[in-house]
Structures are given as C-alpha cells and as structure tokens.
Amino acid sequence: MKKSIRRSGGKSKGARLWYVGGTQY
C-alpha cells in the first residue's frame, strides 16, 4: 500500500484512504 501513497503523491484525497494501511487515517 505504501506504493499507492507515492502514486497519489501523499496529498490527494485518495491518498488519505491509503494512509489507513500506512500510518495516518
């Protein structure tokens, strides 16, 4: 899932959903 965060750039709204599996919700 960490790869998905990088794809979104970590700033997109979708990135927040990915953070759920990473660190931030």
UniProtKB/Swiss-Prot annotation:
Domain of life: Viruses
TM regions (residue ranges): none
InterPro entries: Microvir_J-like
Keywords on record: Capsid protein, DNA-binding, Host cytoplasm, Viral genome packaging, Viral release from host cell, Virion
Disulfide bonds: none
Keyword DNA-binding: yes
GO cellular component, one term: viral capsid
GO molecular function, one term: DNA binding
Coiled-coil portions: none
Subcellular location: Virion; Host cytoplasm
Pfam families given in the database record: Microvir_J
Major subcellular location class: virion
Record flagged with keyword DNA-binding: yes
Function: Mediates ssDNA packaging into virion, it locates to the internal surface of the capsid, thereby displacing the internal scaffolding protein B during virion formation. Protein J binds to and is packaged with the viral ssDNA. Additionally, protein J plays a role in viral attachment efficiency to the host cell.
Family listed: Belongs to the microviridae J protein family.
Record note on quaternary structure: Interacts with F protein.
Protein name: DNA-binding protein J
